[in-house]
């Protein structure tokens, strides 16, 4: 008879921190939302793929909003009330992810775009011919 494997639950640190930083990375294929404290330690995270969207649906604005709401709910359970928002990337889920944070009840104090802009660095991909 096979031995049963015991599953251990992840321990979630319950800290009451009122302020944090929301990092939104929006690419053309996915949107990743990470919420950290002011030191940079991760409190919660979510992405369009982790919420349940697959394939081309991950790149939709609705998937980005759902991912942002999921991450915000997890962090608000740990006591987060105010947050700064740092947005990186040029994907379709930039603005809707911020709206998802506002809809979930998180108070936003700052929105900053930290997208890296090349000074004529890498060559861009060729244009699609359909």
UniProtKB/Swiss-Prot annotation:
The keyword Glycoprotein does not apply. It is found in: Plastid, Chloroplast. Keywords: Chloroplast, Plastid, Ribonucleoprotein, Ribosomal protein, RNA-binding, rRNA-binding. Its main location: plastid. It holds the Pfam family Ribosomal_S11. GO terms for biological process: translation. This is Small ribosomal subunit protein uS11c. It comes from Tupiella akineta.
């Amino acid at each position: 008879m096979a031995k049963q494997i015991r599953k251990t639950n992840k321990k979630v640190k319950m800290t009451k921190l009122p302020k944090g930083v929301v990092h939104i990375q929006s690419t053309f294929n996915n949107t990743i939302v990470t919420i950290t404290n002011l030191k940079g330690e991760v409190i919660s995270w979510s992405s369009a793929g982790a919420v349940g969207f697959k394939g081309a649906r991950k790149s939709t604005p609705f998937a980005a909003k759902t991912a942002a709401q999921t991450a915000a709910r997890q962090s608000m359970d740990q006591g987060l009330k105010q947050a700064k928002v740092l947005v990186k990337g040029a994907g379709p889920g930039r603005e809707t992810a911020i709206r998802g944070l506002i809809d979930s009840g998180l108070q936003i104090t700052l929105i900053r775009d930290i997208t890296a802009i090349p000074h004529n660095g890498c060559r861009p991909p060729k244009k699609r011919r359909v």
